[in-house]
Amino acid sequence: MATWANLGLQDSSSPLMEQLNFFHDHTLLILTMITILVGYIMGMLMFNQFTNRYLLHGQTIEIIWTVLPAIILMFIALPSLRLLYLMDEINTPSITLKSVGHQWYWSYEYSDFLNLEFDSYMIPTNELETNGFRLLDVDNRVVLPVNNQIRILVTATDVLHSWTVPSLGVKVDATPGRLNQLNFLINRPGLFFGQCSEICGANHSFMPIVIESIPMNYFIKWITNMTN
């Protein structure tokens, strides 16, 4: 989860988020190199005392500043396209979870099991336990197994929403009348927090998402208790 004064990305809890972290560092390195190079050239032009009689025309430098940015863009675009296609790929999911956005709460359906659906509301501050997280905890958490491919289907009943869990690298738009899907895998047990990331009305800030990832044997017990 996000913590106070956290300027970086959240710790990754899925292979997809790990790749997004690597891409962030890769892009930041390229941007740093560009900034240093441009700053150095500007400094040299401003503070040297040389006179260039051919400053208005230079075919070589024009070729360089046309070709070099194209090469740099390729180094950014190719990893980005790979990640975009990776996010859209569905790999034989073990479990399908359906999430429906409402004003202003989420409802969930485990479509692989009969009669397993519930609503998830934010716990108000005056009802929150001492060790709870303000504006993040919910009354019914989404429980998912660790190290299993999860497919999530996302839609909405009223206005646009967005189902987002940053530490998993997941962000899916919830659009009324449309079913969007995404595939992810959680590689460690724990609690993962997210929020609606599409402005959807007065209480947009008060519809959090909480995922609890547990081992498969505990997940089966939870499913059994919920369906009985």
From Swiss-Prot:
It catalyses: 4 Fe(II)-[cytochrome c] + O2 + 8 H(+)(in) = 4 Fe(III)-[cytochrome c] + 2 H2O + 4 H(+)(out). It is found in: Mitochondrion inner membrane. It comes from Anopheles quadrimaculatus. Gene3D superfamilies: 1.10.287.90, Cupredoxins - blue copper proteins (2.60.40.420). It is a multi-pass membrane protein. This is Cytochrome c oxidase subunit 2. PANTHER family: CYTOCHROME C OXIDASE SUBUNIT 2, CYTOCHROME C OXIDASE, SUBUNIT II. Its cofactor is Cu cation.
